[in-house]
Amino acid sequence: MKSSEAVKYLGQFVLNEYNENIGIVIGYVCNGLGDVISFIVSLAGEINEIPMDRFVISGTRIVYLSSISYEFKNLIEKLKAVNLRINSLNKLNSDNDINKEAWERFKLKVETVYKEVINEFNELKKRVNSRIQELKNKEKVLDEALIELKMNYIENAISKENYESSLRMILNAKQRIINELDQLNKIQNYILSSENTDVIEVKVIQ
């Protein structure tokens, strides 16, 4: 993205993956060629310089990826790239023009990278599981808060107006958790299904 194009995003809201406003674009940083390398965003009162690849931009909609979604996106790209190189390298195994020692050295480099990607996937899986458990615990707290609210309303300890306002906030918070859990479960299912195939498996190039 060029500087002249990025101008239209100044003052635009930044959304999270659940369509919530979390900040606003107040500027951007370019390299010497005028390519935008980062947005300057006000998030929760803090000024942050955020690399462009952390955003998904569609039209004037700017979505800031969570750390888990961002890492997942990058790992998928790495996995596709290394799988492509493995497939290409396998096809060169019987090529008489290729020096076998050079092929073996190249093979070792590719396999090393592949194992690093697999390790990163395993670490991501732990993070996803931890976040899912954290959200489920928050869900339990909200359920208890909902019971308390309804009991107070039954006992006439809260006005109807305040009750309805508080009820909306709790239900919105619960829906927010449901939305994030849904996304995390999709990531988790992708990783788990991949582990049952030869996609995420340390390959030995033949």
Regions found by a protein language model. Give the residues of each.
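Peripheral interaction segments used for macromolecular assembly
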Residues: 1-206
